């Protein structure tokens, strides 16, 4: 089975690394400070070479042509290989998911939402939404993911877009003491009922403790559309997805940015 038809289906239909998400990880780059001496200086050379060889730099086929990303595309070998041949954890970071596309487009079109503010990108993946926040003038950014390879990919993607890399936390942030953020953004995270419940409670605490603004990107997955969080959402903007994204996401045609206010 091709990689694109195996591991990718989990997020679209609800599986996705729950065991890994519930385990603790590590701090790849320190929170609250920017330790880079230069783009890629903290990358393992072998993994960096592997990512550069097995991903494609692209800015087409998404809602944000301004942002270049290293992604897994049909022109990449591992798009077609058996999933078990990929030597690392499943590369969910290598797909630009539709919820993240919508969030990134919204931040680029509305820079006042993040300008001069602190932003947490929860479940950052390829880092596109954090990159959009940086491009739009956010003063402090933390990208969070559970996969160390995602952290390395985010650093490479910052380099592609001529940005100084921002801090990246590789850990299940839901298990940590909450920090104060002006804005929390999360895209494509409501793919499992248990995870959705945990996110809902964490976001409510974040809102009531710090009055943090929360924006959620989702293309209408049933685990999100049918969740009780819907009672606390208002639609901010809806985007039509490009045809290539529709084909890769089970025919989903739009992606929406939602504001959360419990």
Curated annotation (Swiss-Prot):
It is found in: Cytoplasm; Mitochondrion matrix. GO terms for biological process: methylation; negative regulation of fatty acid beta-oxidation using acyl-CoA dehydrogenase. InterPro entries: Ribosomal_L11_MeTrfase_PrmA, SAM-dependent_MTases_sf. Keywords: Cytoplasm, Methyltransferase, Mitochondrion, Transferase, Transit peptide. Residues 1-38 form a transit peptide. Gene3D superfamilies: Vaccinia Virus protein VP39. Pfam families: PrmA (PF06325). It is an enzyme of class 2 (transferase). It catalyses: L-lysyl-[protein] + 3 S-adenosyl-L-methionine = N(6),N(6),N(6)-trimethyl-L-lysyl-[protein] + 3 S-adenosyl-L-homocysteine + 3 H(+). Belongs to the methyltransferase superfamily. ETFBKMT family. Protein-lysine methyltransferase that selectively trimethylates the flavoprotein ETFB in mitochondria. Thereby, may negatively regulate the function of ETFB in electron transfer from Acyl-CoA dehydrogenases to the main respiratory chain. Interacts with HSPD1; this protein may possibly be a methylation substrate. This is Electron transfer flavoprotein beta subunit lysine methyltransferase. The gene is ETFBKMT.
């Amino acid at each position: 089975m091709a990689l694109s038809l195996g591991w990718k289906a989990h997020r679209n239909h609800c599986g996705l690394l729950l065991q890994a998400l519930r385990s603790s990880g590590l701090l790849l780059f320190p929170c609250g400070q920017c330790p880079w001496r230069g783009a890629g200086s903290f990358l393992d050379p072998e993994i960096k070479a592997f990512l550069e060889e097995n991903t494609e730099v692209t800015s087409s086929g998404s809602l944000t042509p301004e942002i270049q990303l290293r992604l897994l595309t049909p022109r990449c070998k591992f798009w077609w290989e058996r999933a078990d041949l990929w030597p690392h954890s499943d590369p969910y970071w290598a797909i630009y998911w539709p919820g993240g596309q919508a969030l990134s487009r919204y931040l680029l079109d509305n820079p006042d939402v993040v300008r001069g503010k602190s932003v947490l990108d929860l479940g950052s993946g390829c880092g596109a939404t954090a990159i959009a926040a940086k491009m739009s003038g956010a003063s402090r950014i933390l990208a969070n993911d559970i996969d160390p390879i995602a952290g390395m990919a985010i650093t490479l993607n910052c380099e592609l877009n001529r940005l100084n890399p921002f801090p990246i936390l590789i850990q299940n942030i839901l298990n940590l003491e909450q920090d104060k953020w002006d804005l929390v953004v999360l895209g494509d995270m409501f793919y499992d009922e248990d995870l959705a419940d945990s996110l809902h409670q964490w976001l409510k605490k974040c809102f009531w403790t710090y009055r943090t603004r929360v924006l959620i990107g989702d293309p209408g997955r049933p685990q999100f559309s049918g969740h009780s969080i819907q009672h606390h959402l208002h639609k901010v903007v809806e985007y039509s997805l490009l045809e290539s994204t529709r084909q890769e996401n089970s025919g989903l045609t739009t992606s929406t940015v939602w504001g959360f206010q419990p």
